[in-house]
C-alpha cells in the first residue's frame, strides 16, 4: 500500500493546490465521488477495455458525478490526466491524501471512535471535546459500536491509539500475569 500512497501523493497535492484557489470542500466532495465511482468493478472493466477510448472513459467518470465542479475545465483536465496515465485505480488513495491535506490546513483530524455501546449526542459531544483538548486539534468523529470491547472506548487519531476498553485492560492484565 505504501507504493500506492507514494504514487498518489503528487496527484493529491496538485489537486489540493488547484482547490486552494476555490472551494476546498467542494473539491473534497468531487474527489470523494470520483473515488467511489472508480472502485466500481464495472467502471474498472470499461476503463481497461481496449474498445473504449480514453476520452470516453473520462466522459463516463465525469457523467456519474453530482458535484457542480465536474463540468469545470480543471476537473475535466484532472480526470483526463488520470485516465491518460492509467491512474484511475489510485482515486481512492488520492481522496484519502486530499482529505489529509485538507485536515492539515484546517488544523483538524479524523478520529475513529469505537465504543462498546452506542454513544448519544451529549456523550459524544463531551467525548469529542475532551479528545480535542488532549490532541490539541479539531476532530471529525466517525463512531462505530463493537460490543467485544465489553466497556470503554478505543480512539484512533492518525497513528495514535488511545484504548481504554475493558478488553484492552484484561489483555494487559493477562500479559502481566503470564510474564
Swiss-Prot record:
What is the protein's membrane topology class?
Answer: Peripheral membrane protein
Q: Which UniProt keywords apply?
A: ATP synthesis, Cell inner membrane, Cell membrane, CF(1), Hydrogen ion transport, Ion transport, Membrane, Transport
Kindly state one GO CC term assigned in the UniProt record.
plasma membrane
Q: Which GO terms describe its molecular function?
A: proton-transporting ATP synthase activity, rotational mechanism
Highest taxon, organism lineage? Bacteria
Q: Where in the cell is it found?
A: Cell inner membrane
Q: Say which family it is in.
A: Belongs to the ATPase delta chain family.
What does the UniProt record say this protein does? F(1)F(0) ATP synthase produces ATP from ADP in the presence of a proton or sodium gradient. F-type ATPases consist of two structural domains, F(1) containing the extramembraneous catalytic core and F(0) containing the membrane proton channel, linked together by a central stalk and a peripheral stalk. During catalysis, ATP synthesis in the catalytic domain of F(1) is coupled via a rotary mechanism of the central stalk subunits to proton translocation.
Q: Which PANTHER family match?
A: ATP SYNTHASE DELTA CHAIN (PTHR11910)
Q: How does it assemble?
A: F-type ATPases have 2 components, F(1) - the catalytic core - and F(0) - the membrane proton channel. F(1) has five subunits: alpha(3), beta(3), gamma(1), delta(1), epsilon(1). F(0) has three main subunits: a(1), b(2) and c(10-14). The alpha and beta chains form an alternating ring which encloses part of the gamma chain. F(1) is attached to F(0) by a central stalk formed by the gamma and epsilon chains, while a peripheral stalk is formed by the delta and b chains.
Entry protein name: ATP synthase subunit delta
Tell me which species this is from. Burkholderia thailandensis (strain ATCC 700388 / DSM 13276 / CCUG 48851 / CIP 106301 / E264)
The taxonomic lineage of its organism, from the top, reads:
Bacteria, Pseudomonadati, Pseudomonadota, Betaproteobacteria, Burkholderiales
Q: Which gene encodes it?
A: atpH
